Amino acid sequence: MNESQFIEALRAEGFELSETQLSQFKRYFEMLVEWNEKMNLTAITDREEVYLKHFYDSLSAAFHFDFTKVETVCDVGAGAGFPSLPLKILFPHLHVTIIDSLNKRITFLNELALALGLEGVAFHHGRAEEFGKNKKFREQFDVVTARAVARMTVLAEYCLPLAKVGGSFVALKAAKVSDEMADAKNALAVLGGKEKATHQFLLPGEMSERNIVVVDKLRKTPGKYPRKAGTPAKEPLI
């Protein structure tokens, strides 16, 4: 996906990119490739692949969830900033908090935000399980996002404790998500959530399946969740 195709694909979904936004995406790509030589941020470094598999893929969440109606977003395990920083570029009003367990990625994100002139962003080094217990973060966000971090049974325990009651958890998943969602039904209920919708689509060009899963946070998450760091992955809620 070259830049023109990127512009057209977003236009088809009702989003018109400004010159400022286009230059932010260009600089994002340049810094991603530059920093990737020093640290392992991504296996995808070809310009057209980055625009498709990182930028467009991240923004696809906005085709199925209205980010104009929310203010605070927490992105769990964002790595090099996906999906929340492309969403921040598209929706500058968002206040974005990223939690990532690797400190070197936080260093990159701080430099990136500076270079792109992004305000209203905060990057924290640590585990989602720790932040879910912290009163400053627990049930404080309108939306919690995650892309390709873990299976839904695990991901729900990372993310739902951070979403406020009445808020949402938006997961960006690859193919065959229906089995995951069936397995996660009880975990979502235990943690105070319920699946609202799963939107399936094909990534343009390569036509690989993607899914945007939207979960409503209906009730407070019981105090014992999330469990201590490492437990959700080892012993998923079923």
Curated annotation (Swiss-Prot):
GO cellular component: cytosol
GO molecular function, one term: rRNA (guanine-N7-)-methyltransferase activity
Organism: Exiguobacterium sp. (strain ATCC BAA-1283 / AT1b)
Name of the coding gene: rsmG
InterPro entries: rRNA_ssu_MeTfrase_G, SAM-dependent_MTases_sf
Family: Belongs to the methyltransferase superfamily. RNA methyltransferase RsmG family.
Enzyme class, first EC level, given as a word: transferase
Residues that bind S-adenosyl-L-methionine: G77, F82, A128, E129, R147
EC nos: 2.1.1.-
UniProt cross-references to CDD domains, sorted A to Z: AdoMet_MTases
Subcellular location: Cytoplasm
Protein name: Ribosomal RNA small subunit methyltransferase G
Purpose: Specifically methylates the N7 position of guanine in position 535 of 16S rRNA.
Keywords attached to this entry: Cytoplasm, Methyltransferase, rRNA processing, S-adenosyl-L-methionine, Transferase
